[in-house]
Every structure is written in C-alpha cells, then in structure tokens.
Amino acid sequence: MSIKEQTLMTPYLQFDRNQWAALRDSVPMTLSEDEIARLKGINEDLSLEEVAEIYLPLSRLLNFYISSNLRRQAVLEQFLGTNGQRIPYIISIAGSVAVGKSTTARVLQALLSRWPEHRRVELITTDGFLHPNQVLKERGLMKKKGFPESYDMHRLVKFVSDLKSGVPNVTAPVYSHLIYDVIPDGDKTVVQPDILILEGLNVLQSGMDYPHDPHHVFVSDFVDFSIYVDAPEDLLQTWYINRFLKFREGAFTDPDSYFHNYAKLTKEEAIKTAMTLWKEINWLNLKQNILPTRGRASLILTKSANHAVEEVRLRK
C-alpha cells in the first residue's frame, strides 16, 4: 500500500525501516561508537546502524519542525514589535517501563545538540516529580509508583508552564534509582534551553483521561512534539525481567541500594519476583494509563527484538 493510500485510512503515515532510513538524506553521523555505547541502556542493543537508520532521520525531521517553530516565533515578534524571550521547544517521550525511553531521549539529546546551530538541549525525566516515598507511604501508593496519582502533577505542570512562559531559571527535582526516591535538596536548575526533552511514562495524558474532571492542565498541553516508544507486550515483559536480572548482579549489590535484598535471590527467585512486579505494577500501569495515550503521539517508534525499531508512524 502506498503512503498516499494509507493517508486516507489513518492519521499516521507509516514507514518500514528501509523507507524511514531513506529519509536521512545527507545528515552526517556525529556520534562515535564509544559515544553510542555510553548512551545505551543497561539491557539494550544500540548500534551505529540503529542511530543512522532511525535516529538521524528523526533528528532531521525534528530540526525541520524546530526551525519552523523559530520562524513562527520571529513572525510573532515582528508583528508585536518586541524582542521575545527564548521559549524552549518541548519534545516528550512516553512508553512502557523497559521499552527504552531513556536511551531514545539520550540519543536525541546528543544528536540535536550537534546540529550546526549548537542548540542547548536539556533532558529531564519525570521520575523526579514522583512524590517522595514518605508521601507515597502515607497515601498507600508505594505499589502504585509510576501511576499518574504517584506524581506531583502540580509541580510538573508548573515546571513546563514556567519554561514555556520564558522564566529564565526553572528547577526540577532529581530522582535516584539507587535509593528509589527523590533526592532531598537535589534540584537541577534548567536555564533557558533551546530544546527540552521530557521523558516519562505518562507525559501523553490529557483531559480525555479524566472526563469527570475536565479542568486539569496537563504536561501534554505544553508539548510541541511527542514520541511514543512502543513494543509488543511479550517483549516488554522479557526486557523487564532481563533488566531486573542485570540489576541483581549490578546495582542491587550496592549496600545503599533500596533493592539490596534482591541481590541475594537465586536466578529462579529473581525471575519469579520480576514477573510478579511486572504483572502487578508495570503491566497494569501500561494497560490502564500508558497504552491508551499512544494514539496521541506525533510519532510512534515500534520496536522488535533486540530493541531494533522496525516501524515508524508519523502523524500527518
């Protein structure tokens, strides 16, 4: 089926890997193999080929969108006769736990910051906006960590709203996966970035998810371009379990780790524990809150085995 025929049936243009890779045009590879190795996640295969065929075309597309947005801002300033404040272009990245959102975010940050314009690209994860464990315990939400109700949504929305309003210095809390909690007094200051990449589970949620409470303002209201990283559920489960097993041999062995006790599990016990955590928390959050937002994304990256993107869908 041609792209033209698809356009009549869906709000997305659909590309297989080869079609998408052809859209790279002449964008140069600006990352070395060593840099790519540092960018990838704990359980992901990220190659020069993946960056060249998937992420370079995506960075080219985003550069077009961002340049268009800058021209629009310039037109508005000319009309108003003002010198406007620098307003960041916000890119959100959503998707399930273990799908590779963080790797996608880091690769895009590296590529976009290397465009000739030398843009300042900041990366913020919404993990920092989780309520502290003390609050979650008081509210009985420790087993709902990552669900929408576990976040300080007021602070998260204010953060992106302030950035879009031109506030020069905005602070974001920082999360530690070692202590499984927000770092007290560990805020990061974000100073007028050209581009902000916001990575998190629920960044595509909108008022449609709360039909009985329509007065909410959401992060998605401030996002210029949204990406959903997708994969079949069986792969997500496998990746989650494999990641858990690697943490068991790595991060969990640190005595300061919140999950230090998991390091003592046998492999069979660890697999069983990971399966339970997946089914009772992460799969539930995926089905109830994350997956229903996929159709709102500007672009959907669908992965197959080894975290390789096999299909790209771009909203018209």
UniProtKB/Swiss-Prot annotation:
Coiled coil: none annotated. InterPro entries: P-loop_NTPase, PanK, PRK/URK. One of its GO terms (cellular component) is cytoplasm. ATP binds at G95, S96, V97, A98, V99, G100, K101, S102. Its main location: cytoplasm. It catalyses: (R)-pantothenate + ATP = (R)-4'-phosphopantothenate + ADP + H(+). Its EC number is 2.7.1.33. It is an enzyme of class 2 (transferase). This is Pantothenate kinase. It comes from Shigella dysenteriae serotype 1 (strain Sd197).
